[in-house]
């Protein structure tokens, strides 16, 4: 059995938490995040900490409480420090550029690919082959990174494509004659 839910989430100074039934809003220097929690979870806010437990009558109460604790901990980290995700473009002529809140990608297609960034996500290009995504919402950062990677996933023979900075692409050997 996981004991994730038994640990409280400590709320640092400068973070404001509002609990309205099952809807929780966390506000900090990097923005404001809102999430609706499962009905099986009971959240208590006291002494600059959030504690979690199951409600009576729900079989999966502890599992849902552990999930809620992990999600809210990520929200607190997001509004205080924020999250970053780095992408690399590997391939001849593969380039990225940022214009406002649009990521412009040249990925070997006959046309450039423009990807509109959602609100709350910022992107920068330290070089033409790198993209750094920043934001407070961990799930949204991962989704945007996955969307950008999906335009040209790393292929298994040369490794060309869009990859996460920490991703290891396994390459295959070419067919022998």
Curated annotation (Swiss-Prot):
GO MF assignments: rRNA binding; structural constituent of ribosome
Keyword annotations of the record: Ribonucleoprotein, Ribosomal protein, RNA-binding, rRNA-binding
Keyword hit for Ribosomal protein: yes
Gene Ontology annotations of biological process type: cytoplasmic translation
The UniProt record lists the keyword Transport: no
A GO cellular-component term linked to this record: cytosolic large ribosomal subunit
One Pfam family matching this protein: Ribosomal_L6
Role: This protein binds to the 23S rRNA, and is important in its secondary structure. It is located near the subunit interface in the base of the L7/L12 stalk, and near the tRNA binding site of the peptidyltransferase center.
Matching HAMAP family: Ribosomal_uL6_B
Family membership noted in the UniProt record: Belongs to the universal ribosomal protein uL6 family.
NCBIfam families to which the protein is assigned, alphabetical: L6_bact
Quaternary assembly: Part of the 50S ribosomal subunit.
UniProt name for this protein: Large ribosomal subunit protein uL6
Species name: Cronobacter sakazakii (strain ATCC BAA-894)
């Amino acid at each position: 059995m996981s004991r994730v839910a038994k640990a409280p989430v400590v709320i640092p100074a400068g973070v404001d938490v509002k609990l309205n039934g099952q809807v929780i809003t966390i506000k900090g220097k990097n923005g404001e995040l809102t999430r609706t929690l499962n009905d099986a979870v009971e959240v208590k806010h006291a002494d600059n900490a959030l504690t979690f437990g199951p409600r009576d009558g729900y079989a999966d109460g502890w599992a849902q409480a552990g999930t809620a604790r992990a999600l809210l901990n990520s929200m607190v980290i997001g509004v205080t420090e924020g999250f970053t995700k780095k992408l690399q473009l590997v391939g001849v002529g593969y380039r990225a550029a940022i214009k406002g809140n649009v990521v412009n990608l040249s990925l070997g297609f006959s046309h450039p690919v423009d990807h509109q960034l959602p609100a709350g996500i910022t992107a920068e290009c330290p070089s033409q082959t790198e993209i750094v995504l920043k934001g407070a919402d961990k799930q949204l950062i991962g989704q945007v990174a996955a969307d950008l990677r999906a335009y040209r996933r790393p292929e298994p023979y040369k490794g060309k494509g869009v990859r996460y900075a920490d991703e290891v692409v396994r390459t295959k050997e070419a067919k022998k004659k």
